């Protein structure tokens, strides 16, 4: 009984067909791997964008009203430390703090502002309340009522840290908070503060563009400042 081996032509054809199959499988695996990697990158960008928008929204909502200042690629504001109501009694400004965690005496560096209309008011028309003690059921700024520029219709006051201004900036593809990076892969960003009107409070318009691997995702969000003077 005779046996027959492969001819040279059959061997070459087998190698060619095998190589084609291997290349096809490798290309399929590479395509799947690249698709997975791209999906991971997209998910990372989306997660980062959601984190940044949520962080910005929370901080902007609870800022001192009209404490915003936008300049170019930066937006600055003052967070609220305490808030409450006040009354003018003689030459004194007496006030209550609604936050039950407020300490007495008040911490160093705190200032009180009433009815601010711009960020500069927090510097020029505020009252230093550092060290004040709640010894009569309320705090009091003594002998300062005469220099109060304007009153709040709802008798509201806001206490902030005079050295605690927060500034968000977009530079070199990054968004930073007081110099600390909070997001990268940002190709464009803008923060615009719209002053309050009779129909609404102050509004911050956020526009962000994240770019990675030649793919861009655009995000826009309006954040209303919840507090009013």
Per-segment meaning from a language model:
Residues 2-61:
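Aliphatic-rich helix starts adjacent to a transmembrane/signal segment
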Residues 4, 108, 200-202:
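Residue-level preference for short coil/turn positions at secondary-structure junctions
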Residues 6, 157, 168, 191-194:
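Aromatic-residue hotspot detector
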């Amino acid at each position: 009984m005779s046996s027959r081996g492969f001819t040279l032509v059959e061997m070459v054809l087998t190698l060619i067909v095998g190589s084609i199959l291997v290349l096809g499988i490798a290309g399929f695996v590479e395509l799947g791997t690249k698709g997975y990697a791209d999906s991971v990158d997209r998910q990372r960008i989306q997660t980062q964008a959601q984190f940044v928008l949520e962080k910005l929204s929370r901080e902007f909502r609870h800022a001192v009203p009209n404490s915003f200042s936008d300049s170019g690629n930066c937006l600055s504001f003052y967070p609220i430390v305490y808030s409450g109501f006040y009354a003018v009694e003689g030459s004194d400004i007496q006030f209550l703090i609604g936050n039950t965690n407020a300490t007495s005496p008040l911490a160093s560096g705190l200032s009180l502002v009433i009815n601010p209309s711009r960020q500069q008011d927090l510097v020029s028309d505020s009252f230093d309340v550092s060290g004040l003690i709640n010894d009569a059921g309320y705090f009091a700024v003594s002998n300062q009522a005469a220099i109060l520029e304007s009153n709040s219709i709802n008798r509201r006051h806001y206490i902030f840290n005079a050295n605690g201004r927060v500034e968000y900036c977009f530079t070199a593809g990054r968004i930073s908070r007081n110099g600390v990076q909070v997001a990268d892969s940002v190709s464009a960003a803008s923060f615009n503060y719209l002053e309050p009107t009779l129909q609404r409070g102050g509004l911050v318009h956020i526009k962000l563009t994240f770019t990675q691997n030649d793919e861009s995702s655009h995000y826009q969000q309006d954040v209303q400042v919840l507090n009013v003077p």
